């Protein structure tokens, strides 16, 4: 650590050995700017003092112009990229700002490039036939404009140059383009892959980044130059994961193309395709269907049609080949030696050149490789704002209403006083109702105590979690700044112990889940203030409050009627027996009275 501090103070960010630092003084080099001292040397001090003295003597005074400090790094990131969320990765010490973003294809319109291109007229870029080539007559003309034509047109018209090369962003990956599985509904991003190469040739298809770099170093763009012109390889680092139909999309139907072939000895030439063997063998070797010039093409997918495989000057070995699934686009190669690509060009905000696991907010000078498409960047998982938007836009139908349970407030009594064994025994024997009431009261107070205790605990944990989160953010920002400064001054992983390995445990997600679980668990304790209404809501689902009150009234009336039906026979029997007793007693009274009168006579 002392050697690093010493090297930093002496102004030499380069790597020096201990032996050289002890034996020889460190010398500066005028040719290498990285060896220039960061702090003034003794000679520079003398020159500065002399200039100050001269200015004081002559009376010449100059205003001090303070350099404008750069803005916040993260705000600059958001303004330049249009991203409000991002994260850093420490997988590579040489790339401390590797992002955790992924690329997604996005529909491109000419209006998005207004102010960045010479003109936005890309309406005459041509079309792509998806069923038959134009050389086959009599068939359907099912044409559409794939996205790569519009992308190529706009990229060739970029006219806003950048001062420096656009910074490269290392992505976790990018989304593949969709396949064409429905010929009547082609996606707005289908066939959006483009490739960059000198003279717009398909020579570098499937090449790795390293292989392409080595080839271009040995073979310059211009054969007249003895040195290689500057170029930027835009092929993905993991190119084997971002190539072919798995990345650029595929055409799910057969494409019929005429093979007008000529024979020269044992070789055949069919347009741009040539080689030994019959063209029919080439077609069937790729899984296609061969139809010679004497037959008709009968196809049922994507719809039924019949076409004649005829043409002018067809040789004996000519015919039509129904090729299997074709990679899209068919030939989107852009010549990167044109004038518009000699300097880096700017792209509109929030639009990126995405090439697999690499992205640029602009077009580098003389790009070579691919495949690439224009799109946007997003987080691998939705952030909190996206989740809230999804919940706000989601359908609210079919939600089951909760019971009318009110939470315990802060004014409830939490004084728990339990009875002893003697009181419980006498109360349960002599007054069971009093014992039950006492038990219910103590249960309510225990619930109140539990709620208050849980609220205090969650509040305390919430404050601690906020403090830990703020400390974590500060530590990560400071560590990222320190690593960036050390790497910028040439210090690698071996200079500072633990520089490339920084383990800061992150249990915030687990803590947040448990914290939310505690809050939900507290809400499980409540008082059911309307048991009948809760029962009705549970039976009939999400009914309104007016329906609940109506059902409660009907239920009350039904209960009254049932009580009357049950009690009315008993009441009538009691009344009739009472009347009968009264009548019998009256009759008995009159009988006794008559007997008494008869005896008196």
Swiss-Prot record:
<dbReference type="GO" id="GO:0046718">
    <property type="term" value="P:symbiont entry into host cell"/>
</dbReference>
<feature type="glycosylation site" description="N-linked (GlcNAc...) asparagine; by host">
    <location>
        <position position="383"/>
    </location>
</feature>
<dbReference type="GO" id="GO:0019031">
    <property type="term" value="C:viral envelope"/>
</dbReference>
<protein>
    <recommendedName>
        <fullName>Envelope glycoprotein gp95</fullName>
    </recommendedName>
</protein>
<keyword id="KW-0325">Glycoprotein</keyword>
<keyword id="KW-1032">Host cell membrane</keyword>
<keyword id="KW-0261">Viral envelope protein</keyword>
<feature type="disulfide bond">
    <location>
        <begin position="193"/>
        <end position="248"/>
    </location>
</feature>
<comment type="similarity">
    <text>Belongs to the Alpharetroviruses envelope glycoprotein family.</text>
</comment>
<feature type="glycosylation site" description="N-linked (GlcNAc...) asparagine; by host">
    <location>
        <position position="79"/>
    </location>
</feature>
<feature type="disulfide bond">
    <location>
        <begin position="122"/>
        <end position="153"/>
    </location>
</feature>
<dbReference type="GO" id="GO:0019064">
    <property type="term" value="P:fusion of virus membrane with host plasma membrane"/>
</dbReference>
<feature type="glycosylation site" description="N-linked (GlcNAc...) asparagine; by host">
    <location>
        <position position="316"/>
    </location>
</feature>
<feature type="glycosylation site" description="N-linked (GlcNAc...) asparagine; by host">
    <location>
        <position position="455"/>
    </location>
</feature>
<feature type="region of interest" description="Fusion peptide">
    <location>
        <begin position="420"/>
        <end position="440"/>
    </location>
</feature>
<dbReference type="Pfam" id="PF00429">
    <property type="entry name" value="TLV_coat"/>
</dbReference>
<keyword id="KW-0175">Coiled coil</keyword>
<keyword id="KW-1161">Viral attachment to host cell</keyword>
<keyword id="KW-1168">Fusion of virus membrane with host membrane</keyword>
<feature type="disulfide bond">
    <location>
        <begin position="412"/>
        <end position="448"/>
    </location>
</feature>
<keyword id="KW-0449">Lipoprotein</keyword>
<keyword id="KW-0165">Cleavage on pair of basic residues</keyword>
<feature type="glycosylation site" description="N-linked (GlcNAc...) asparagine; by host">
    <location>
        <position position="292"/>
    </location>
</feature>
<feature type="site" description="Cleavage; by host">
    <location>
        <begin position="403"/>
        <end position="404"/>
    </location>
</feature>
<keyword id="KW-1162">Viral penetration into host cytoplasm</keyword>
<feature type="glycosylation site" description="N-linked (GlcNAc...) asparagine; by host">
    <location>
        <position position="142"/>
    </location>
</feature>
<feature type="glycosylation site" description="N-linked (GlcNAc...) asparagine; by host">
    <location>
        <position position="121"/>
    </location>
</feature>
<feature type="coiled-coil region">
    <location>
        <begin position="437"/>
        <end position="487"/>
    </location>
</feature>
<keyword id="KW-0946">Virion</keyword>
<feature type="disulfide bond">
    <location>
        <begin position="261"/>
        <end position="270"/>
    </location>
</feature>
<feature type="region of interest" description="Binding to host receptor">
    <location>
        <begin position="264"/>
        <end position="289"/>
    </location>
</feature>
<dbReference type="InterPro" id="IPR005166">
    <property type="entry name" value="RSV_p95_env"/>
</dbReference>
<keyword id="KW-0564">Palmitate</keyword>
<keyword id="KW-1160">Virus entry into host cell</keyword>
<feature type="glycosylation site" description="N-linked (GlcNAc...) asparagine; by host">
    <location>
        <position position="182"/>
    </location>
</feature>
<keyword id="KW-1169">Fusion of virus membrane with host cell membrane</keyword>
<feature type="glycosylation site" description="N-linked (GlcNAc...) asparagine; by host">
    <location>
        <position position="159"/>
    </location>
</feature>
<feature type="glycosylation site" description="N-linked (GlcNAc...) asparagine; by host">
    <location>
        <position position="308"/>
    </location>
</feature>
<feature type="transmembrane region" description="Helical">
    <location>
        <begin position="555"/>
        <end position="575"/>
    </location>
</feature>
<keyword id="KW-1043">Host membrane</keyword>
<feature type="glycosylation site" description="N-linked (GlcNAc...) asparagine; by host">
    <location>
        <position position="260"/>
    </location>
</feature>
<dbReference type="GO" id="GO:0020002">
    <property type="term" value="C:host cell plasma membrane"/>
</dbReference>
